[in-house]
Amino acid sequence: MKHSYFISDLHLSETQPELTALFVDFMQNLAPQAERLYILGDLFDFWIGDDEQSTLIQQVKDLIKSVSEQGVQCYFQHGNRDFLIGERFAKDTGVQLFPDYQLITLYDKKILLCHGDTLCIDDVAYQQFRRRVHQKWLQRLFLCLPLKVRLKIAEKIRAKSNQDKQAKTQEIMDINQAFTTEKVQEFGVNLLIHGHTHREAIHQQAGFTRIVLGDWRKNYASILKIDESGEFGFIKD
């Protein structure tokens, strides 16, 4: 039966080879069987520019390109860790880049996709930071810096982010229900899929279904499957 996959929040890095191994297995064995593959952000733990080269980056690019060349339509939506992924990455892999909110039609069903961080409006400090780093002039300036400098800046930002999380409640870092409902109504859908919060779940809410993609861990890959009959669910071992 025809089907598509949705993944997010893999946070791939050279310090966690077990996550890369899970991704390799998925891309070599499951992904080629799908019609479409949607990656909803934070594929990488951080991204400092399309010009960065590493063994991991090349491996991931090659895997996505291979799946794309096998006829799978691949899509990428930026996360809060890899929002600097650009057109060069898209060209190298064959993915189509999505904006922050993307409306798709899959098997006659309208679905709203987003990474999920834009729904967490109660985290005021993060939203202020997000607005700053998404300014195009600042991004252009950052990308003009030497790679080593960019890497140091990214490491400092990541460390501060991890520190700040310790002082925030789970409620603040979760989506705002009222705002999320407004977004769903704005786009006129009854199915929303997002990641970011790392809380894999399928929520039946008033008037719509909200599917939250989980983060990938040492022994678990969070993979959502939707087939042409309209059935959906997370793949379990």
UniProtKB/Swiss-Prot annotation:
Cellular component terms (Gene Ontology): cytoplasm; extrinsic component of plasma membrane
Residues bound to Mn(2+) 1: 9, 11, 42, 198
Pathway: Glycolipid biosynthesis; lipid IV(A) biosynthesis; lipid IV(A) from (3R)-3-hydroxytetradecanoyl-[acyl-carrier-protein] and UDP-N-acetyl-alpha-D-glucosamine: step 4/6
Gene3D superfamilies listed in its UniProt record: 3.60.21.10
Keywords: Cell inner membrane, Cell membrane, Hydrolase, Lipid A biosynthesis, Lipid biosynthesis, Lipid metabolism, Manganese, Membrane, Metal-binding
MF terms (GO), sorted A to Z: manganese ion binding; UDP-2,3-diacylglucosamine hydrolase activity
Binding-site residues, substrate: 80-81, 123, 161, 165, 168, 196
Names of required cofactors: Mn(2+)
Reaction catalysed by this enzyme: UDP-2-N,3-O-bis[(3R)-3-hydroxytetradecanoyl]-alpha-D-glucosamine + H2O = 2-N,3-O-bis[(3R)-3-hydroxytetradecanoyl]-alpha-D-glucosaminyl 1-phosphate + UMP + 2 H(+)
Annotated localization: Cell inner membrane
Family matches, as Pfam families: Metallophos (PF00149)
CDD domains membership: MPP_YbbF-LpxH (cd07398)
Cofactor note: Binds 2 Mn(2+) ions per subunit in a binuclear metal center.
Function: Hydrolyzes the pyrophosphate bond of UDP-2,3-diacylglucosamine to yield 2,3-diacylglucosamine 1-phosphate (lipid X) and UMP by catalyzing the attack of water at the alpha-P atom. Involved in the biosynthesis of lipid A, a phosphorylated glycolipid that anchors the lipopolysaccharide to the outer membrane of the cell.
Xref: InterPro entries: Calcineurin-like_PHP_ApaH, LpxH-like, Metallo-depent_PP-like, UDP-diacylglucosamine_Hdrlase
Membrane topology of the entry: Peripheral membrane protein
Major location category of this protein: membrane
Listed name of the protein: UDP-2,3-diacylglucosamine hydrolase
Family, similarity comment: Belongs to the LpxH family.
Organism: Haemophilus influenzae (strain PittEE)
Record GO biological process: lipid A biosynthetic process
